[in-house]
């Protein structure tokens, strides 16, 4: 007989042992289940469990925190893509960076496709590894923009770097652009740009062809320093002259360009582009290349997907260009002819409207306005007439009142060309500050609009100015797409405090302020801006001409936003980059590597 006291002790011991065994078994089961969920081997793993165990039903684990974050990111990205489709190019442009951030060189749509792949994958370790591998391969493909053109291979990787030297022989000066490209991708990726400019332009040398050619030497020295010596013999160099040399006449301009080609071929190691490599560039090419430059740097062209593009307005010294991609309504028919430009870039085709208005660059516009002022008073003035050779360094002896000069300001020794080889030199004086009908630029705006010749016959309606056909920007260009104005448009707004984004009406107000004179400048502008205005007495005329061209000439509404910049991502705007890209196609670039004489 067991003592009741001993019996209770035995029962208590058995109970404790049972409880301990239960907890030990539960903990072991929990560890096994956790290991099964987290470390479940793939089907092709050498450690696959026995079939019976593998067949046991296992509930799929809940989505991981990483998946939730990816799904949230995907939803946010889809929302952003929806907004981007509505606003086309996003927020206002800062002046030095693209208006939206691109991911791995592609549009956000590609990233969304990649995230969709990740979101729909199962939480199997092997599948996750495959997804990560696929995403890595896709990201690599995205960086290349399109299928890479592997020109030279090193351990299976393309590392081709090529250079282009482009010289812009403009009307007021010459500029060199030395571009460095990664040519392993299509379109080529711009890595860096070296830029230098000097004055005067080639056209100022007139018949001194040797002097004109040698004037480019400082620019070519920049190229020699930038391009590695082992690359120089296979680096193309081109010299493209614009309106200034075009206005010099065919005989004189050809003599200068022939001497430039000879100088490059004899004295420099670069591969000189044949045929039109050293030439006067056609105005339509100048505008289209400027359009390519801007939209290439903005990321609008070059990818597989066709994106909305920006309109481009370029203002040089001798001519101005307009280029945009019209979107015609159903009831509108594009006009064939010289204004229509069709070409292919990357995987997409573009049909552009373009026109180069020769004689309507800023310096030519100045001269046209000053012509009107002087012609009205020429009969009552005793002025000496000069030829183009004689006018250099000539001093004025007569003052002429000009409504395009601010009150109290004098533009000294202004050369006015009235006809072929007919020049006069005068001092242009601003009106009295008491004359409210003149001060403020109203009369100057009238003169600026008059030189645009809006009353000229328009044979193919609608027209912009001087009888030139132009599709309506209001009807055929999306109101949310960007309009970029650069070169002299930038040079006459940025130095006096204008932001990188402004309306035509704000430009008109700025023009009025500048024409009112220094008394008003000091109340509104910073000291540096006032200093800049004092250094250029014809700033009022320039702004009046620019405003008239954009609003009255091109018919851009007053409320329309414009964007201006000198560079995008530290790369110069203008036609040079657009003209350099085709030279990288070694099969069709019209140049061959030179034999390196140092070898």
Curated annotation (Swiss-Prot):
Residues 65-76, 120-133 have a biased composition (Low complexity). GO terms for cellular component: Golgi apparatus; Golgi membrane; membrane. Belongs to the GDA1/CD39 NTPase family. After transfer of sugars to endogenous macromolecular acceptors, the enzyme converts nucleoside diphosphates to nucleoside monophosphates which in turn exit the Golgi lumen in a coupled antiporter reaction, allowing entry of additional nucleotide sugar from the cytosol. Pathway: Protein modification; protein glycosylation. GO terms for biological process: cell growth mode switching, budding to filamentous; cellular response to neutral pH; filamentous growth; filamentous growth of a population of unicellular organisms in response to neutral pH; fungal-type cell wall biogenesis; nucleoside diphosphate catabolic process; protein glycosylation; protein N-linked glycosylation. Residues 47-64 have a biased composition (Pro residues). The gene is GDA1. This is Guanosine-diphosphatase. The active site is at residue 286. Residues 25-599 are lumenal. The keyword Metal-binding does not apply. One of its GO terms (molecular function) is UDP phosphatase activity. It comes from Candida albicans (strain SC5314 / ATCC MYA-2876) (Yeast).
